[in-house]
Amino acid sequence: MGETRPIRVASVPTNHVYVRHLSPPEGDPTITRLPDPPPLRATSTDQSQWWPPAILTAEWVREHADDFDLAHVHFGFDALDPEDLEAWADALEAAGHPFVLTAHDLRNPHHPTADLHEAQLGVLLSRAAHVITLSEAAAEVLNERWGVEASVLPHPHVVDEDWLERPRLEHDGFV
């Protein structure tokens, strides 16, 4: 029996609190997430900067096809044309790599209208090997609007366990 290696995931992004909390704090020997490559048009030397994501280009996929097994898109595609996303999906398909989409936003609050985001989602939803979303309500919208069956994985906590478990003061306010 041959030795197995971890599944190598190119996440968009990798260095984001949501993505970091998808794995146990001690790590998961069955999955390795690639570090975020330097962003396109980088204006910072900050290693935590991941946007705009280079992974979402056909060129990056072609140059790094041997470095990963699966792509996982969370967000970061809001500045891309739908045609660029099609080219990216074509490059993944040519390389034999599927991608998973986590549909976080059904409406992008940074866009003045819904048109561009819906066109982007249309491309990604039609090409993804699997779609994940965070709530049953979002899954229903994805099914009604795009005919997509999505798995629901509720949002993981994004604060440290110590903070999450600390006692809270009683109060009458609403947060």
Task: Describe the predicted segments one by one.
Residues 11, 49-54, 60-83, 98, ...:
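Short N-terminal targeting/anchoring amphipathic segment
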Residues 1-45, 62, 66-68:
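N-terminal subdomain of nucleotide-sugar transferases
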Residues 78-84, 109-115, 158-161:
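Acidic-and-aromatic substrate-binding clefts and catalytic sites of carbohydrate-active enzymes
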Residues 85, 91-97, 145-157:
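P-loop/Walker A phosphate-binding loop and immediately adjacent motor/lid segment at beta-alpha junctions
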Residues 87-98, 114-130:
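Membrane-proximal helix-turn-helix segments that form the acceptor-binding/catalytic region
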Residues 144, 154-172:
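Acidic anion/phosphate-binding donor-loop and adjacent secondary structure
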Residues 137-139:
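Alpha-helix capping/helix-boundary segments
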